[in-house]
Swiss-Prot record:
This is Tripartite terminase subunit 3. Keywords: DNA-binding, Host nucleus, Hydrolase, Viral genome packaging, Viral release from host cell. It comes from Human herpesvirus 8 type P (isolate GK18). Residues 67-91 are annotated as: Disordered. A motif (Walker B motif) lies at residues 316-321. InterPro entries: DNA_pack_C, DNA_pack_C_sf, DNA_pack_N, HSV_TRM3, P-loop_NTPase. The gene is TRM3. GO terms for biological process: chromosome organization. The active site is at E321, D476, E550, D662. GO terms for molecular function: DNA binding; hydrolase activity. Interacts with the terminase subunits TRM1 and TRM2. Interacts with portal protein.
């Protein structure tokens, strides 16, 4: 920040410069440059012929916008009160006296008789092109729409309301500039350069136009923010100002569609001649015809009557509360994506009751910037918002909050008492649905990409010389045949002899029982044995297997699995043993306890530090049939969540609705057994 004395000095310099520089440079005759070749000059309709380098400077555009604004100086709207044209005029540029003198030396007037004939022809052609653009009927039609909408929203639509929220301005621009692209496709870029001044977008490059020209736009906005309110105003002014345009409106409930239909009729009848309207209530259609012009139409429908919009032709289709639209109605709506001159605008709040139905959130990964989200928490502080119960708005206070929205801790607490998480969803919009997957993410995307892409060729002789002689296998058995529930996870890890902290994943299995029979222990042991055999064939340097069979679910079944595996394993195998406190007997099972958190932390650190890799020839007889085993594991790693406990500890979980974390737990524990030297492995003693 500037110190106060520097700020005062700069303000004094600015005041002195503005007082001394009075050159306005308003020319009645065109100006031509001296000694400028044709390839290095350009004709400008407001100035004359100048050097082409001016096209890369904002000074020329600022000067023209100031003295030749595209916005009308005396607007005559059909409704409402026009806004002052000075509101959208940039600051007047000031020229130093030395710069002004130099420019006058380089430029001459047309009446100085030094301009060449070809420069005059170039200027006249540029001027004619500019005048023809302003004389275009499409330009006047679109200009009338902006003037009418601006005046209508200037305290006429709702008394006392003169300004729009940022998302409402975005909605107007997405609607308007798409109309420009279909009404005047050859002159879209020229009209964009003119009409962007109406929105105060003086420094916006023409490349942004591609965003407005896209076939679909999505707006996720919290409730009670004026979504339907601005849609009614836009549709009303479109019908009254633009000819030959077809608009569609689809709502999630019949009473909403009827309310919008009635409000648009009320608005048009109040501010425009009622004789221009042709209302057909039986099919929810409004036809507006201006004297001497072609008619424009609006059809209001609901998702329950999806066949009513089939066969229609819409240039603009507004889908209100799209997250609550019936899924079987979506094909009829999305069919308009195939129409060349049609745009779909989805407007919705986030579905609090079932976040999985917020299908619009999938568009955040689209190649086009289709998703527009109104949120009161920025991405940088989303974690702070979730971790602090008393926090109700973004700590940086950079985001705009309307005056008619009340956000405080008491409202947050009361809302969440009705339904947990409802306030967060409504407040954060897209953030609440996506933050659950990213809030507690503990493994970075770069680390996962490296783990997935950089796999080690463990069959190479140079690599096998560095592999350890012992293979660590962890079995997390599940005794169920329900493929939607848990399955048996098996992980196999080997360490490096050169770097003990570095380890490699050689095999993984996610096994589900076919039937619940007495052979469950044998099937699980056979699955692990098949994996060990394949690993032994690919890596002949491995001499012994250190195994751990989890016995938390069933100690008897765990002992049975270890016993069978001990008999059929092709390599010498040792097991972790659990000592029975009552009988002092040792069983070949492992009772998983509080060390699970330590194992996850070790695994997470290994992934983030790059000390854990996967083999190019990962053995998997249960996953590889339909999925890449490493990618399958990565999907479970992405779901790892670290949840703080009340006692100050931490708990890790990766359970998902569509996928269990059995394989991940097995790999995590196998890695933990391989890198931790506190565990003792012993063979099963014959009785």
């Amino acid at each position: 920040m500037l110190l106060s004395r520097h700020r005062e000095r700069l303000a004094a310099n600015l005041q002195e410069t503005a007082k001394d520089a009075g050159e306005r440079w308003e020319l009645s005759a065109p100006t031509f440059t001296r000694h400028c070749p044709k390839t290095a000059r350009m004709a400008h309709p407001f100035i004359g012929v100048v050097h082409r380098i001016n096209s890369y400077s904002s000074v020329l555009e600022t000067y023209c916008t100031r003295h030749h604004p595209a916005t009308p100086t005396s607007a005559n709207p059909d409704v409402g009160t026009p806004r002052p044209s000075e509101d959208n005029v940039p600051a007047k540029p000031r020229l130093l006296e030395s710069l002004s003198t130099y420019l006058q030396m380089r430029c001459v007037r047309e009446d100085a008789h030094v301009s060449t004939a070809d420069q005059l022809v170039e200027y006249q052609a540029a001027r004619k092109t500019h005048d023809s653009l302003h004389a275009c009927s499409v330009y006047r039609e679109l200009q009338a729409f902006l003037v009418n909408l601006s005046s209508f929203l200037n305290g006429c639509y709702v008394p006392g309301v003169h300004w729009l929220e940022p998302f409402q301005q975005q909605l107007v621009m997405h609607t308007f500039f798409f109309l420009v692209s279909i009404k005047a496709p050859q002159k879209t870029h020229q009209l964009f350069g003119l009409f962007k001044q109406y929105f105060g977008l003086f420094e916006t490059p023409n490349s942004v136009l591609q965003t407005f020209k896209q076939k679909a736009s999505v707006f996720l906005i919290p409730r009670r923010h004026g979504k339907t309110w601005i849609v009614v105003a836009i549709i009303s002014m479109l019908l009254a100002s633009v000819e030959n345009i077809n608009i569609g409106y689809v709502a999630h409930q019949k009473h909403v569609a009827n309310s919008v239909f009635a409000e648009i009729i009320k608005t048009l009848c109040r501010w425009f001649p009622p004789k221009n309207l042709n209302i057909k209530k039986e099919n929810g259609t409004i036809i507006y015809t201006r004297p001497g012009g072609r008619s424009s139409s609006l059809m209001c429908a609901t998702c329950f009557n999806k066949n009513s919009i089939r066969g229609q032709t819409f240039n603009l289709l507004y889908v209100d509360e799209a997250n609550f639209i019936k899924k079987d109605a979506l094909p009829a709506i999305l069919g308009f994506m195939l129409q060349k001159d049609a745009k779909l605008i989805f407007i919705s709040s986030v579905n609090s009751s079932d976040r999985s139905t917020s299908f619009l959130l999938n568009l955040r990964n689209a190649q086009e910037k289709m998703l527009n989200v109104v949120s009161y928490v920025c991405a940088d502080h989303r974690e702070d918002f979730h971790l602090q119960d008393a926090l109700v708005s973004c700590p940086c206070y950079r985001l705009h909050i309307p005056t008619y929205i009340t956000i405080d801790e008491s409202i947050k607490t009361t809302t969440n008492l009705f339904m947990e998480g409802a306030f967060d969803t409504e407040l954060m919009g897209e953030g609440a649905a996506s933050s659950n997957a990213t809030l507690y993410r503990v493994v970075g995307d770069a680390a996962l990409t490296q783990f997935d892409m950089c796999r080690v060729d463990t069959t190479a002789q140079q690599v096998q010389k560095c592999l350890g002689k012992q293979l660590f296998v962890y079995i997390d058995p599940a005794y169920t045949n329900n493929t939607e529930a848990s399955g048996t996870g098996v992980g196999a890890v080997v360490t490096s002899t050169q770097t003990p902290t570095r380890s490699l994943i050689l095999g993984m299995e996610h096994f589900f029982l076919r039937d619940l029979t007495g052979a469950a222990a044998y099937e699980i042991a056979s699955c692990a044995c098949t994996m060990i055999k394949a690993i032994a064939v690919l890596h002949p340097t491995i001499e012994r297997v250190n195994a751990a069979v989890e016995g938390n679910s069933s100690q008897d079944s765990g002992v049975a699995i270890a016993t069978v595996l001990n008999e059929i394993c092709p390599l010498p195998i040792h097991f972790l043993h659990y000592t029975d406190k009552s009988s002092a007997l040792q069983w070949p099972i492992y009772m998983l306890g509080g060390e699970k958190s330590s194992a996850f932390e070790t695994f997470i650190y290994a992934l983030n530090s790059g000390t854990l890799s996967a083999s190019q020839t990962v053995v998997s007889n249960t996953i590889k049939i339909s999925f890449d085993p490493v990618t399958y594991l990565v999907e479970q790693v992405r779901a790892i969540k670290c949840v703080p406990l009340r006692d100050g500890g931490q708990s890790y979980s990766a359970k998902q609705k569509h996928m269990s974390d059995d394989l991940l737990v097995a790999v995590v524990m196998a890695h933990f057994m391989a890198t931790d030297d506190r565990h003792m492995y012993k063979p099963i003693s014959p009785q």
